Amino acid sequence: MDQHQLDEENQRAALFHSSAPSSSLGADGEEERETVPLLSCKMADDKSDTVQVSEDTAHQISIDPWYQVGFILTTGVNSAYVLGYSASIMVPLGWIGGTCGLILAAAISMYANALLAHLHEVGGKRHIRYRDLAGHIYGRKMYSLTWALQYVNLFMINTGLIILAGQALKAIYVLFRDDGVLKLPYCIALSGFVCALFAFGIPYLSALRIWLGLSTVFSLIYIMIAFVMSLRDGITTPAKDYTIPGSHSDRIFTTIGAVANLVFAYNTGMLPEIQATIRPPVVKNMEKALWFQFTVGSLPLYAVTFMGYWAYGSSTSSYLLNSVKGPIWIKTVANLSAFLQTVIALHIFASPMYEFLDTRFGSGHGGPFAIHNIMFRVGVRGGYLTVNTLVAAMLPFLGDFMSLTGALSTFPLTFVLANHMYLTVKQNKMSIFRKCWHWLNVVGFSCLSVAAAVAAVRLITVDYSTYHLFADM
C-alpha cells in the first residue's frame, strides 16, 4: 500500500471515530452531548459556525458513463406518467398554451438543471446529495430544509408511480373481466408489493444497468402503441372537442395546476444524486446527459402527449391507454409494459431515500447481496414502500399528486433553489443584468410555487369530496 492509500485509510479511520458522540460542558455546568455524523468537510452556518458535509455513502459513485446517466434521466421523463400528460397538461391549457408550455418548460428546466450541474464541485469537492450542496452554501438549516423538500418530492413521485402501476394492472384485468371484482386499491397494493421485490434485489442506482435498457424498451412499447392507436382513433373520429372544460374559476385553478405539471414532467428533484454516479469530468459529462434528456429523450413525451390530445380532445383519459380502442392483446402488451417500466422508474426516484437508509442504518459490512444486507433491505425498504402504497391506495388522484409535487418541491428545488444557489456562489463574477435575471427567477418561481400549491390542494379537496378513501377510479 503506497503513501497515498495510507493517507486515505487514515482519513476514513478519522471519519469513523468522529461519528462517536462527543461531550462538553454547557454554561450551566451540565454535560451536553452532541452526535457528530460521518462527515468530511466543513461549511459555514448562519452563525459562522462550521457544519460538515457528508461524503460517506453505502452506494457506488463516480462509475457510470454519461450515456447511462442520460438513460436514467430519460427513463424518468418517459415513465408511464407521459400517458397522463394529454389530460393533465393539454386539456387545461389547450393547443396553444399546452404546446408553448411544454417547449418553454423544457427550456427553463434545461437551464435550471445546467445551473445545478455546474455547482456539483463547489468548494473543490463533490456534493453527492442535494442537501449536502445546499448545506455547504447556506448552512445547517437549509441542509435540513432541502432534505425535507426532496423527501416530499420523491415520496409523492413514488406515490404517483404506484398509482400508475395499479391503473395499468386494473386496465389489464378489465380487458378480460370487467366485473368490478378487482378494485383499484387491490391493484395498487399488488403494485407496491412488486416494487418492493424489485427494490430488495437492486442495491443501488448504478446497479440498474441492464434494467435501464429494458426500461427504454418498455417505454417505447407503450408509447408507440398509444401513439399508433390514438392516431387510428383520431382518423376514424373526426369530430373532436378541444374546449377547455370547467367554469371560469375552475379554469384558473386547473391552469395553475397544469403549469405545475409542466415542470413536473421534466425534472427529477434529485439531480446531484444522479450526477454523483457519473464519471469525471462530472460537469461536462452531466451536460451531455442533460442535452440527451432534453433533445432525443423528450421526443417520445411530445409524440404521445400531442397525439393523445389530438385524438380525444378534452375527453382524454388521465391514463391514455384507457381511451384507446383496439385489439385486446395489443392493449394488454401496452399496459404490461407500462407496469414494468413503472417498477423500474420508481426505483430511480426512491434511490436517494434508499441511499440515506442504507448509509445511516445499514451494517456497512459484506457485499450488497450478503444475507444480512438483503434482510436489511427487506425490512427498511419494505417499510418505506408500504407507507407509499398505503397513501397511493387511500388517495388515488394521480393528476392532483402531479400538481402538488410540482408545487411543493419541483418549483422550489429545481428553479428557486438552483437559481439562488448559483447567484450566491457566482455573484462576484456576475454582471448586474445576470444578478437581476436570477433574482427574477427566484421571486417569480416562488410565487408560482405558492399559487400552484393552493391550486393543487383545491383540486385534491374537490376530488376527495367527489370520491372517498380507497376509491375505485
Curated annotation (Swiss-Prot):
Record GO biological process: amino acid transmembrane transport
Protein name per its UniProtKB record: Proline transporter 1
Positions with biased composition (Basic and acidic residues): 1-11
Subcellular location: Cell membrane
Gene field: PROT1
Family as reported in the entry's similarity comment: Belongs to the amino acid/polyamine transporter 2 family. Amino acid/auxin permease (AAAP) (TC 2.A.18.3) subfamily.
Membrane topology reported for the UniProt record: Multi-pass membrane protein
Native source species: Oryza sativa subsp. japonica (Rice)
Keywords attached to this entry: Amino-acid transport, Cell membrane, Membrane, Transmembrane, Transmembrane helix, Transport
Entry GO MF terms: amino acid transmembrane transporter activity
Main location: membrane
Gene Ontology, cellular component aspect: membrane; plasma membrane
Lineage, top ranks: Eukaryota, Viridiplantae, Streptophyta, Embryophyta, Tracheophyta
Domain of life of the native organism: Eukaryota
Residues that span the membrane, as ranges: 65-85, 88-108, 145-165, 188-208, 210-230, 252-272, 290-310, 333-353, 378-398, 401-421, 437-457
Function: Proline transporter that mediates proline transport across the plasma membrane when expressed in a heterologous system (Xenopus oocytes).
InterPro entries: AA_transpt_TM
Region listing for Disordered, in residue ranges: 1-31
Summary of the tissues where the protein is detected: Expressed in roots, leaf blades and sheaths, stems and young panicle.
